């Protein structure tokens, strides 16, 4: 696996940014197709380096021959902020186009996935469901549609400035309804959380919402397992998500 720290200018954010990339490399003389790609989002208080530093991601990705892109979203909740950057637009639209220009990544929907932990799990649901024709599968680890807690509530004003997200492309319940209407073309969703996680009630509310659509359009998997909100649980959840996503190495 090649590990890269990629710096470039983001037009959406109006500033220089960095992301981490893991890309499988070819053996001598081997010609490989453009790579299946996972966009992997960090949680509140973490950064674009956290997945590499705190999990066994590289080993898991190598086993599945999967490229992984890890952007930085600060504490944005993957939102186009009223008093800050347009992180939703950056990660939903600009980042995939830039990465495919820089790296040998597949442009096919069936080869493109998004997942995240905590705030990143919320972001993966938000972006994956708002762009259902772009992602074949979504992984939500230790999160739900609403992740508000007392320590993050003060950021709501910076993120939205009182702006209502209802009926916008950042309205996750509305995106769920639109994606569900696609039927078999909707993204698959894998959702897991620890039984001692402080966001468990949010995850269960999200489970109930996703399960309310007839016909299981998301081929939805929901799992509660022993564990708290942290990297020890997240590492195992990442391994399980990738096994669900791609049972056999490519």
Language model segments and positions:
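Non-catalytic cap/lid and distal C-terminal segments of serine-dependent acyl enzymes
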Residues: 1-250
């Amino acid at each position: 696996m090649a590990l890269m720290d990629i710096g470039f200018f983001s037009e959406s954010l109006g500033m220089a940014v960095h992301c981490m990339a893991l890309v499988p490399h070819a053996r001598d003389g081997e010609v490989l197709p453009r790579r299946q790609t996972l966009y992997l989002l960090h949680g509140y208080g973490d950064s674009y380096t956290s997945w590499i530093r705190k999990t066994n991601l590289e080993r898991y990705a190598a086993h599945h021959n999967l490229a992984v892109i890890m952007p930085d979203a600060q504490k944005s909740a993957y939102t186009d902020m009223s008093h800050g950057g347009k992180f939703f637009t950056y990660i939903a639209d600009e980042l995939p186009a830039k990465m495919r220009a820089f790296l040998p990544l597949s442009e096919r929907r069936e080869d493109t996935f998004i997942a995240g932990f905590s705030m990143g799990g919320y972001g993966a649901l938000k972006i994956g469901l708002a762009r259902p024709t772009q992602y074949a599968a979504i992984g939500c680890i230790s999160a739900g549609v609403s992740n508000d807690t007392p320590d993050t509530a003060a950021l709501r004003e910076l993120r939205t400035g009182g702006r209502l997200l209802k009926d916008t492309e950042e309205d996750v319940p509305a995106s769920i309804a639109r994606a569900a209407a696609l039927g078999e073309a909707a993204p698959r969703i894998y959702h897991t959380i620890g039984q001692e996680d402080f966001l468990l009630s949010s995850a269960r509310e999200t489970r109930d919402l996703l399960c309310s659509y007839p016909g299981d359009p998301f081929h939805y998997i929901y799992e509660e397992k022993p564990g708290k909100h942290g990297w020890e649980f997240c590492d195992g959840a990442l391994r399980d998500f990738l096994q669900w996503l791609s049972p056999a190495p490519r």
